[in-house]
From Swiss-Prot:
Protein name, UniProt field: Lysine--tRNA ligase
EC code: 6.1.1.6
Organism expressing this protein natively: Actinobacillus succinogenes (strain ATCC 55618 / DSM 22257 / CCUG 43843 / 130Z)
Subcellular locations according to the entry: Cytoplasm
GO term, biological process aspect, one: lysyl-tRNA aminoacylation
Keyword Nucleus in record: no
Pfam family name, one: tRNA-synt_2
Primary residence: cytoplasm
Coiled-coil spans in chain: none
Record-linked Gene3D superfamilies: Bira Bifunctional Protein, Domain 2 (3.30.930.10), Nucleic acid-binding proteins (2.40.50.140)
One MF annotation (Gene Ontology) recorded for this entry: tRNA binding
GO cellular component, one term: cytosol
Binding site for Mg(2+) 2: E420
Length: 503
């Protein structure tokens, strides 16, 4: 018999024993009570009493009620040391026969298993090894776990199981719990920042008749009552700008977007973004906002502006570098033979891109080719926080053209560690120019570009009523969480990432 077969037999055998224990509990009455009320978390008790010596603790005689999942147990005759885990951390229990009502230890405590959830009332004391411990006077089994924990000693190591059964990952891995606490702090910190700046939080449609606001392939669904196809939104941008037209001069939305595209360590089809718009501001103001926000998040979450990530350390305390797309291509592409003239002529740009092994789409103009060259030769070099600016108008259909060079836009992308974290620009508020750019996107879509934008006539109508000078930005929450949690994959910071169906 193989080791795997032995393991499966042990697993099913243990489950059978646990089911028998649950049946015995049911026979006694309520097997899943909901009357226990705890008054302390493990971490709070450690913070309050870890530095208190045993004699002082004995004098104070603090009474506590704690609850959590049994993670370890060590029986010693008529007493058992148990470690329970709650949302804040772990604490040790001392459960002894002599401290409990007659029969409770033998009949109840001895039947407890790893993974069970228990409630304990007792007195805090220090063991001989100076470990803070709860001496139990009252005990109650709150939930009988029928399935054993996956690995009693090494945690949950299988990556796919961690993603599919995140609850087991959170039980077993302290680092995973820390990651999602950091994610929560990122979201809370962003919300606090924008509300403090006078922005109002809004919600815009997830189901849209016309998906807009980004170049991406949407998910399609059908609304039965209206009998129309609809799309999960790829971005909230066009709705948020309608609100600025309506007089909400500072708005933000923190919510989900959906893009029917590939899955990678950086991409999940369902992801979270903060998108905000500020009237009477330009893209320079938003770059300043972004620096200030990320500096604040680093200090609040990590206590420093130095952010470690893999082999790198990012310094959020210094001003972020700002470089145009053309300058970045020339700076990092020179060793591959890229010269200035290649960036201003379509045929030369195509020839340079082809030498780099870039597959050129028929619908691409000069701007798209230059952008592809940038992605090939320069993007991965933008390690320290860097704002890439002056994107071609062709690839920025919603951004305002630059006053001095209308071939490029007043746009920026924030790169950290060679990855795009955010995208923002001074908004295009010329309704006629916007209509023309939508038409160009329609032509690109007709030519085979699946990610080209749809035309939104209602949005053009809104612009015709007058959009004040405005700038807007979107920041990827998942990628920020990766950054602050030092997580290598986007799946590590999404509680339930998209996975193939398991047969």
């Amino acid at each position: 018999m193989s080791e795997q077969q032995n393991t499966e037999l042990d697993f099913h055998g243990e489950m059978a024993v646990r089911r028998e224990k649950l049946a015995a509990l049911r026979a006694k009455g309520n097997a899943f009570p909901n009357t226990f009320r705890r008054d302390a978390l493990a971490q709070d008790l450690h913070h309050q009493y870890d530095e208190t010596d045993g004699e002082q603790l004995k004098e104070k005689n603090p009474q506590v009620a704690v609850a959590g999942r049994i993670m370890t147990r060590r029986a010693m005759g008529k007493a058992t040391f148990i470690t329970i885990q709650d949302m804040s951390g772990k604490i040790q229990l001392y459960v002894a026969c002599d401290n409990l009502p007659e029969g409770v230890y033998a009949e109840d405590v001895k039947s407890w298993d790893l993974g069970d959830i228990v409630g304990i009332k007792g007195t805090l004391f220090k063991t001989k090894t100076n470990e803070l411990t709860v001496k139990a006077h009252e005990v109650q089994l709150l939930t009988k776990a029928l399935r054993p924990l996956p690995d009693k000693f090494h945690g949950l190591s299988d990556q796919e199981t961690r993603y599919r059964q995140r609850y087991l990952d959170l039980i077993s891995n302290e680092e995973s719990r820390r990651t999602f606490v950091i994610r929560s702090k990122v979201i809370a910190g962003i919300r606090e920042y924008f509300i403090g700046k006078g922005f109002i939080e809004v919600e815009t449609p997830m189901l849209q008749v016309i998906p807009g606001g980004a170049a991406a392939r949407p998910f399609v669904t059908h609304h039965n009552a209206l009998d129309i196809d609809m799309y999960l939104r790829i971005a909230p941008e066009l709705y948020l700008k309608r609100l600025v037209v309506g007089g909400f001069e500072r708005v933000f939305e923190l919510n989900r977007n959906f893009r029917n595209e590939g899955v990678s360590v950086r991409h999940n089809p369902e992801f979270t973004m903060i998108e905000y718009y500020q009237a009477y501001a330009d893209y320079h103001d938003l770059m300043d906002n972004t620096e200030e926000l990320l500096r604040k998040l680093a200090l609040d979450i990590l206590g420093t502006t130095i952010v470690p990530y893999g082999e790198y350390e990012f310094d959020f305390g210094k001003p972020f570098e700002r470089i145009t797309m053309h300058d970045a291509v020339l700076k990092y592409g020179a060793e591959k033979g890229i010269v200035k003239e290649d960036l201003y002529d379509l045929e030369r740009a195509k020839a340079a891109a082809t030498k780099l092994g870039i597959e050129i789409q028929k619908s691409w103009g000069l701007g798209s080719v230059v952008n592809a060259i940038f992605e090939e030769v320069a993007e991965h070099h933008l390690i320290q926080p860097t704002f890439l600016t002056a994107h071609p108008a062709e690839i920025s259909p919603l951004a305002r053209r630059n006053d001095e060079n209308p071939e490029v836009t007043d746009r920026f992308e924030l790169f950290i560690g060679g990855r795009e974290i955010g995208n923002g620009f001074s908004e295009l508020n010329d309704a006629e120019d916007q209509a023309e750019r939508f038409d160009a996107q329609v032509a690109a879509k007709d030519a085979g570009d699946d990610e080209a934008m749809f035309k939104d006539d209602d949005f053009v109508t809104a612009l015709e009523h007058g959009l004040p000078p405005t700038a807007g930005e979107g920041l990827g929450i998942d990628r920020l969480a990766m950054l602050f949690a030092n997580a290598p994959s986007i799946r590590d910071v999404i509680l339930f990432p998209a996975m193939k169906h398991k047969a």
